[in-house]
Curated annotation (Swiss-Prot):
Gene Ontology CC entries for this record: plasma membrane
One Pfam assignment: KdpA
Assembly: The system is composed of three essential subunits: KdpA, KdpB and KdpC.
Family: Belongs to the KdpA family.
Keyword Magnesium assigned: no
Disulfide bonds: none
Transmembrane segments: 2-22, 60-80, 130-150, 173-193, 246-266, 278-298, 374-394, 412-432, 483-503, 525-545
Protein name: Potassium-transporting ATPase potassium-binding subunit
One function term, GO molecular function aspect: potassium ion binding
Organism encoding this protein: Bacillus cereus (strain AH820)
Keywords: Cell membrane, Ion transport, Membrane, Potassium, Potassium transport, Transmembrane, Transmembrane helix, Transport
Function recorded in the entry: Part of the high-affinity ATP-driven potassium transport (or Kdp) system, which catalyzes the hydrolysis of ATP coupled with the electrogenic transport of potassium into the cytoplasm. This subunit binds the extracellular potassium ions and delivers the ions to the membrane domain of KdpB through an intramembrane tunnel.
Localisation: Cell membrane
Top-level taxon: Bacteria
Length: 555
């Protein structure tokens, strides 16, 4: 039965992707029906905020994005610092320490949701609602807006206006879907209240304080926006965030909903639906490979414990919730790192070496399918690299969507693709070279190295999950991961928007017999190969020194 449930879940991922992709295209391309429903409210927002609906250049678009996000970071930072004297604080939680507030504000504005605090004990209700939940809407709306401008540029159209796209992302996508799914989560047993903790008496006669709060509304946007941060410190392992298998499947569907829809949106917007389907299928094959790998590893159990004769029929159950089991815990770990969400229903630090390698590789690739918007930008970056390499091999000028890929575009892409490895490996080396970093490691040897690299990888690609054996609630880790999150988020968004703007100005080259097609199985294979060769091999030495070496040691 468990495998039937897995297949049904996978089919649900596939079935909802195309309709959602069609809806996104209509939401941002001026559907008359949607304009009638949402238009009056949006125009009121534009009037109050003074937004004028005009087409921006790529520099204006990028500057608007960065400035608005920067302003939000500052506002939320002060909410965290002052929460002790602000209302909606029934637990009387004190203001955050400066570096932790810095880290947390950047974490949620960049859609990372890395948490160096425990949710129920570190934030007041005001901070959870006005600070965290607000950014959980604003962060994915930012990148969904940007990816629409990015696709318009690839299609040779005007980029649009950031503030208009940002507003539409909120009013037409995130608010309505999050509202409906929050009600579903309430029906499934997730609490939604502004009352404080309650005191219960256990069967042993001991009094226990049970924390609750506006959890359902938090969880819906947490998953839909690929945010991933937990209302509670234990995230989606907590029964109030994820009561059972139905809520577990719904959370995975929400995580995959927008990332899997964007290839179809892209295909419709650029006038090549088949290319969108090829991208979707190619990435789903990589996703399946990751799921099969992690599930096989976890079901085989820990080799060291197996050698001691310990029963392992259920696989490696360390760090997993019994109500989800090994298979669905493995699927959740694959989904949350493929969609760059970072929510967890099992502790990733307790995964087997190869089991832990899959989430790490998913994040390093940042394309399968990646987070809302930002992941799809990376997908197209790899697609352009695949076209460029193919063109060089046959001696033709590379073309993508009928436009020549030349030096300017490839220089921007080269800088972008090198930036993330430099961030991840550079800061990992810094942490390993000082006691400020190594003192946080709870496991010596290969696993300790993986803990450090996982933390910076998760920060750079805005995932937010962690190997939580790492003691990262220190000034060093707060500042360094904060910088990595900020740079990892905005650098690639700006450079790839510049690539789209450059292609927008180019004329379409007529298709000939010798044109390399990007909407067939051959391109899909080359695309996957490019991701593996360029993406995975960049980090291969680290993977050998970390999870692979740990696996061989246990064997």
């Amino acid at each position: 039965m468990i495998w039937v449930a897995v297949v049904i879940t996978m089919l649900l991922f596939i079935l909802v992707a195309k309709p959602t992709g069609i809806y996104l295209e209509k939401a941002f391309q001026g559907s008359k029906k949607l304009d009638k429903v949402f238009g009056p409210f949006e125009k009121l927002i534009f009037k109050i905020t003074g937004v004028k609906e005009y087409n921006q250049t790529w520099k204006q678009y990028a500057l608007s994005l960065v400035l608005l996000n920067g302003f939000m970071i500052v506002v939320v930072y002060f909410i965290f610092r002052l929460q002790g004297v602000l209302p909606l604080n029934p637990a009387h939680i004190e203001g955050m320490e400066p570096t932790l507030a810095f880290n947390t504000a950047i974490s949620f504005m960049t859609d990372t949701n890395l948490q160096h605090y425990s949710g129920e004990n570190g934030l007041s209700y005001l901070s959870q609602l006005i600070g965290i939940t607000f950014l959980m809407f604003a962060a994915p709306a930012t990148t969904l807006a940007l990816v629409m401008a990015f696709i318009r540029g690839l299609a040779g159209k005007e980029l649009g206006n950031f503030f208009v796209d940002f507003t539409r992302a909120l009013t037409r996508v995130f608010l309505p879907i999050a509202f409906v799914t929050a009600l579903v989560f309430v029906a499934l047993g997730v609490p939604q209240t502004l009352d404080g903790a309650v005191t219960a008496q256990t069967i042993d006669g001991v009094k226990q304080s049970i924390v609750r709060g506006p959890v359902a509304s938090f969880v819906s946007i947490k998953e839909l926006g690929n945010n991933g941060g937990g209302f509670f410190g234990t995230n989606s392992t907590h029964p109030f965030e994820n009561p059972g298998q139905m809520s577990n499947i719904l959370q995975m569907m929400l995580m995959m909903l927008l990332p899997t829809a964007l290839p179809f949106t892209y295909g419709r917007m650029v006038g090549n639906k088949k290319q969108g389907r090829i991208l979707f299928v190619s990435l789903f094959m990589v996703f399946l490979l990751g799921f099969i790998t992690i599930t096989t590893s976890e079901l085989n159990g820990n080799p060291a414990l197996n050698a001691m004769g310990i029963e392992h029929v259920q696989g490696s159950t360390e760090g997993k919730e019994v109500r989800f089991g090994t298979v669905f815990s493995s699927l959740y770990a694959t989904v949350t790192t493929a969609a760059e969400t970072g929510a967890v229903n099992t502790m990733h630090d307790t995964l087997t070496p190869i089991g832990g390698l899959v989430p790490l590789v998913n994040m390093m690739l940042n394309t399968v399918y990646g987070g809302v918007g930002a992941g799809f930008v990376n997908i197209i970056m790899y697609a352009i690299i695949a076209v460029f390499i193919s063109g060089l091999m046959v001696g033709r000028t590379p073309e993508f969507l009928g436009k020549k890929i030349e030096g300017k575009e490839m220089k921007l892409i080269a800088v972008t693709i090198l930036f993330h490895p430099l961030l991840i490996l550079g800061f990992s080396a810094l942490a390993l070279s000082t006691s400020l970093g190594t003192d946080a490691i709870s496991n010596l040897g290969f696993h300790g190295l993986t803990q450090v690299v996982y933390e910076y990888t998760s920060s750079a690609v805005n995932n937010g999950s962690g190997f939580e054996g790492l003691g990262d609630a220190t000034t060093f880790w707060n500042i360094t991961t904060g910088l990595v999150m900020f740079l990892g988020r905005y650098f690639s968004l700006v450079t790839m928007l510049a690539v789209a703007a450059s292609l927008k100005e180019k004329t379409v080259v007529p298709e000939t017999v010798g044109t390399f097609r990007t909407d067939n199985g051959l391109f899909g294979g080359i695309f996957i190969g490019t991701i593996v060769i360029v993406g995975a091999l960049t980090f291969f030495p680290m993977l050998v020194l970390g999870p692979i070496a740990e696996f061989l040691t246990l064997k």
